[in-house]
Each structure stands twice: as C-alpha cells, then as structure tokens.
Amino acid sequence: MQEQYNPQDLEQKIQKHWDDNKTFVVTEDANKEKFYCLSMFPYPSGRLHMGHVRNYTIGDVVSRYQRLQGKNVMQPIGWDAFGLPAENAAVKNKTAPAPWTYENIEYMKNQLKLLGFGYDWNREFATCTPEYYRWEQEFFTKLYSKGLVYKKTSSVNWCPNDQTVLANEQVEDGCCWRCDTPVEQKKIPQWFIKITEYAQELLDDLDNLDGWPEMVKTMQRNWIGRSEGVELSFAVNGEESPLEVYTTRPDTLMGVTYVGIAAGHPLAEKASQNNPELAAFVEECRNTKVAEAELATMEKKGMDTGLRAIHPLNGREVPVFVANFVLMDYGTGAVMAVPAHDQRDFEFATKYGLDIIPVIKPEDGSDLDVSEAAYTEKGVLFDSGEFDGLAFQEAFDAIAAKLEAEGKGKKTVNFRLRDWGVSRQRYWGAPIPMVTTEDGEVHPVPADQLPVILPEDVVMDGVTSPIKADKEWAKTTFNGEPALRETDTFDTFMESSWYYARYCSPQADDILDPEKANYWLPVDQYIGGIEHACMHLLYSRFFHKLLRDAGYVTSDEPFKQLLCQGMVLADAFYYTNDKGGKEWVAPTDVTIERDAKGRIEKAVDDQGREVEHSGMIKMSKSKNNGIDPQEMVDKYGADTVRLFMMFASPADMTLEWQESGVEGANRFLKRVWKLVHEHTNKGTTEALDTSSLTGDQKALRRDVHKTIAKVSDDIGRRQTFNTAIAAIMELMNKLNKAPQESAQDRALLDEALKAVVAMLYPMTPHASFAMWEALGESDLDSATWPTFDENALVEDEKTIVVMINGKLRAKLVVAADATEEHVRELGLKDENAMKFLDGLTIRKVIYVPGKLLNIVAN
C-alpha cells in the first residue's frame, strides 16, 4: 500500500472494481437471509445536496454492515422523476421537462457513484418512463373496477388571469406566483382513491410497527384521526333536508345556541342566492384557502343566513351561520356550536352577541364560570332535562340512545382522514388512464391500450399544460366510439407509493413479480425525512395493502424499520439591501472572527461588507448556505465526507456542518492509514497465541474485543453510528501507543487493525478495502464482520475505588474473584487510606462488588 493516503486515486480504482465485478448486484437466494435496505429515492433536481448525502450514507452504512453479517443485501436506487420543479425549470430554460430531467439523472448518478454507495444499479428506474407508470395506470384501472376509485368535484386554486390551476406552492400570499392575481377557489371534477376504506386497518397496524419512531406513529394516528361520536340531524325551517352534524361531545347538546356551516355547503349557496351581502361573504370564504392548522389562530368570521335550525331534542330554534372556521373538506361541512363548552364557539358567540348557555359543571362541585372563556372539560350535566346529573359517558350513551330512538341520530365512528385526491392539473406526471365517451360515460383504458404515454416533445408556455392545450392529444376511441382522454395527471405521490416494491422485480411484465416481491418484502430498513410522515409513508402503507388485497404481496406493511434522519444545518449570513430585504451570502464567501469561546464576533463577505450571522439553519438554496458535496469529495475524498456525516451527530438528530469537523475526520483516517502502513511494512506476523499473553497484552486485547462488541451493538441494534465511530477512535488511540517490539505485540496489533478496518468499512469502504488487502486479506466486500471473543472480555483483575467520607482516596487492583473480606482488608491497610483515616473511628464499610469500597468515619 502507498505510504500516503490519497483518496482521489484510491476511490476511483475501487469504484471501478465494484462496477467491473458487479459487487452489489443481487438475486434472490433461498439459502441466505435477505436484507432489503432502502433510502427514499431522490428527485432529480440537478445536484445532490448534503441532505441527500446524509440519507444515502446512512443507508449504505446499514447495507454494508448487514452484508458482512452474511446476509443477501439489496440496496437499490432510482429517481422520483415527475413533478412541478421540472415544469418550472423547463419554462425558465426554454426546454421541455423530459430532457432537463434525464440530464439531471445522468449527472446525479455520477455523483452517487463518486460517493461509493453500494447500489444494485441493475434495478435503477425513473418514474417518468412509460415502462414504470404503465403498471401504475393498469393498477388504477383495477382499483376502479373494484369500486375503490371515483370522481367528484373538489376545490382547486384557480388563477383567473392565466386561466390555470395552481399547486398550493404556487400560491403566495393568496396570489398567483406568476402574475400576482388574487387566486380563487374553483370546483372541478377530480379523481379520488378510497383510502378511508382502509382507515381502521391503517390505524390498527401502527401497533405492529415496533421498528418505527413513536413520533411518526403518533403523527399518523393524529392524521387518521379516529374519533367516536354521534351523527345527528337538525331540521331547518323551510328546508326539506336536515343539517347533518357530527360531534364527539353529545353531552353538550342542550347547550347548542347556533349551527355553523361551511361556505361551500349547499345550504350556504342556496341562502346566498337572494342575499348579495351573504353571497359576497361566501365568495370571500371560498377564495381564502385555510389550512386546518391555522383554524385555531385565525380570526373567526361569520354571517347569519337568516335560516333557523331546530334542536333535535328540545325543539328550540337556533340561527344558522356561515362561518369561516367550518371546512367543507372535513366532516359534513356543518357543526353544532356550544359556546359555553368550546373555545372557538365561545369566541364566535362573543363576537356576534349569541347566547352562551352552560350545561356542564365540574365534577368536583367547584364553581362554573364561562364569562371569560369556555369550560371545555368533561363534567356533570345540568339544565339538560332528563339528563341532569349524568357524567360524560352516561350522558353520551343516553343522549345517543334517545336520538336513535327518535330517528334523529346514531353513534358513529369518524375519521379525520379524507380520500386521496390523485388528480393534478399539471403536465409533467403520469396520465390518468380514463376516457369519457360522447354519452358522458367514463371508462378505464383497456389494459391492451396501456400505457397512455405522456408526450415528451412539448413546448412549455408556463401557463397551460401541453396535453390540455393540444386538443388532438385528448382524442381517442373506446370500443370504436369517439372518446376524450383524461388530461389530468397523477399526483406524484402515486409513483413514490409503490416504487419500493417495483425494485424487487423492475423488469417484470406486471406491476410486480409476486415470487420475487415476497422474497424481498417488506423493506427491512427504510431511511428518510420525518417530513414524509403523514403523506408518503401513509400512502405507501395504503398502497401495500392494496397490493396485498390484489394478491401481489403477502405482508401487511411495506417497511419494518424506519429511521428518520435529521436535517443538515450550516451557518447562514446576510446583509440588508437598499430595499430593506435580506441578501444571503454563501458561508464560503465569508471571513469570520471568533471570540475566546468560539462565538462569531464579526463576519465580512468577499466584497468587504459586514454581514449578520443568522445562526445554524437548514441548508437551502434560498438561504444560500448549502455546501456542494462535490467540492468536499474533491478536497477530502468520499470516505472522509461519509465518516464526518456519520460521526458528527446521532443519525436522527440535526447535523451541524463544520468544515473543521470534516478536517478532523480526514486526520483520523490518515492516522489509521499510517498505522496500517507502518505495521504491514514490517512484514508478516506470526499467529497470535492468546494463552501466553502478558497482562498488558491481555488488557489491550480486551479493549479490542470490547470495542467489537460495542460497535456491533451500536450499528446493528441501536443505530447510534456516532458512538460506534467514537469507540473505534478511542481504540485507535490505544493502538497508536501500544508496543510493537515482540512478535506477539505485532500479532496482537494485526488482529486489532483487521478489526478496526472491518468496523470502519461501512463508513469508509474505499480506504478500508485497500487497508484490508494490505493486511493480507482478500475482498473485504464478502468478508465476515468481526466477532468478539468472550474469553478476551474476562478480566483477571479489577480496580476497586476506595471512597472515604464520599471522597476518592485510593484505588486497589485485586484479582477478579477477590472476596469482600480480602478487599476490605486491603482497603483498610492501603497507605493512602490509612493517611485519611488517621485519628478517625470507622463507623461503616460498604462494599459494591467489583467496583467500590465506601468507608464512613468520624
């Protein structure tokens, strides 16, 4: 091996070896335990960022570790290639999304290879190819025939100037990002998949996901939002149909003083027809898209419709208000309002002078006061007629029973989860395989006419989707009759909901090859950001159950174990421009002065401007604080970047990018390289004779095997990769100081270095591969992970700490099997101990076996 560690030459050579030998190409092998490791696949944006590097390094570390455990490891990669950014880039660069996407894939693929990730490139695919989305289209038609797909009108963001639908991220402060026109809500027909039919199973099966972070499971439970309540009807004067509402608090029913309905409710539309003021308010509400998260803090507004609803039990008439906090997308679009016992209802009632009637009082008999705020706790009913004195559950059951007996309500289970709207009015997505014939009937495209191919040679005007603008593209036939294609495309979450399964058989002439899929699935380790907790991870779980029910897979869940890696943070700097806005400056263009504690005192950019330090924040283009992985690999080598990524922070916590830390990782690798070089340069070593080791040699070997045990547990079970690396570093410090005079010294060092190199292999595969060869071994990629020798961990001697009146006063080295009497005797005779006990009377001696002798004296 070369004396100097030169990663650039070394890494290229070893990457070529992996390519030539197809090292990471795998097939099913019934005789080997499989391990499927998957990192969330990237969107081909053009360049890898450090968030990608962290995600894929974690995946590669897990994969290589499992490989050395003797498992049949599959680690695939591909491209989540459809999506809005490609359309925006195409408009900006005056090209089509397809060539931009394919060029980016090629560039990013090379970047991934330079980082040494052990992918099975034979399984690579991009979701924007017909070979991939063709099976998605066919599966969608099968779901349609099963009754799991339907079409209904739903609201979208509409720009009246451009006459186009906008994605949520294209709406800025309520206006179109392109022309600044106020955005409206427009109802159009869209396709939905019935995820709600699987709501209970999706909820229940979370209990089986022992390998998932509790936080993600909690987020999904809340998103699914199961609640038990009562569905009840309020008749409306002058209307045939009653208002249906759902409540989880039927015990408060006698305190209802108004009913709130959403602006999109049919009753609101009807009431506003002859009421211009109400019509204007309804329009305002409908064009103000409110996220559910904002409901608690937004200003509550409403308007009386003039309609009166009739209380289902006491017959009292209450006003019906259109209210901006009632959403049509959730529940029935109508709520019963109890201002005395719901804070939102209280604020609204206070604002509009509506009655506040308390009907629940504290169980402990304390005074009830609803003058300043609602009393929202459960309690005992009063002023509720026959239900007075009942506690929550008794009242719930009794009121539900009475409503049911009178045909005005029933107990029901409700879910917050809504069906999955999969239509997007964009171009760069998979075409939805449905057609409409001239009689207005909708039909799925027959399997023999799939895929419906998205034309790639298009011109983007930045306004209308090319397949909507091209009237000829939509023209087709169905059973010989003229028909029009659906010009909406699938939500890109569709492609990412089943890609993990396609990797098992990427060339299959069906969505999956069941035999191969059931060998590899479920994924043993999935790695990705927690931001995907409620969308991608839920849709993938749903899709897996659809695949199971269609007979393709036998497992219930797609991902056994989930690791959500933390974000990568970096220093961010800005100066204020003439208009008062922030101009962000790249950290690489900033010179920093620090105080004695390392805090930034002054920062100046390359133009001589003093800039403000905004702190350590997430790397992003908008803050101009991203660090190009390519530059770091060119400067330090892939192994150093990988090692820093795994060492700088626990995998599930944020990582603060510090180039000084990268330099530290590089120095450590060089130290390992140097010791291996020095050791191998001295020639071959004799066999290690463990029976004739000296005390010091036994102690060093014990450290080696303790480290193997710790690193194996840290990587394999705990996934605390940073502590595994810290343990290897600690061992290296001892090896650097170890004597190398005798033949057995060198034999012991040989065993230790082989263990160190193998343990570093998942993090630093290139350097480890070369050092392994230098140590006289062959092909580290198919080697076996080091195992610790139980006998080496057995200690001949123990160090006992002697404490006198709570202070450390002496240390005793005793035989590992020394008795308590022997330790007491030695402790009381120890010179240091005797010095501190002089003139004192011993009151108590406490012995903690193998660790501590505690003497209390006065």
Swiss-Prot record:
Its EC number is 6.1.1.4. The keyword Metal-binding does not apply. It catalyses: tRNA(Leu) + L-leucine + ATP = L-leucyl-tRNA(Leu) + AMP + diphosphate. InterPro entries: aa-tRNA-synth_I_CS, aa-tRNA-synth_Ia, Leu-tRNA-ligase, Leu_tRNA-synth_edit, M/V/L/I-tRNA-synth_anticd-bd, Methionyl/Leucyl_tRNA_Synth, Rossmann-like_a/b/a_fold, tRNAsynth_Ia_anticodon-bd. It is found in: Cytoplasm. A motif ('KMSKS' region) lies at residues 618-622. One of its GO terms (cellular component) is cytosol. One of its GO terms (molecular function) is ATP binding. One of its GO terms (biological process) is leucyl-tRNA aminoacylation. ATP binds at residue 621. Keywords: Aminoacyl-tRNA synthetase, ATP-binding, Cytoplasm, Ligase, Nucleotide-binding, Protein biosynthesis. It holds the Pfam family tRNA-synt_1g. The keyword Cytoplasm applies. Its main location: cytoplasm. A motif ('HIGH' region) lies at residues 42-52. Belongs to the class-I aminoacyl-tRNA synthetase family. This is Leucine--tRNA ligase. The gene is leuS.
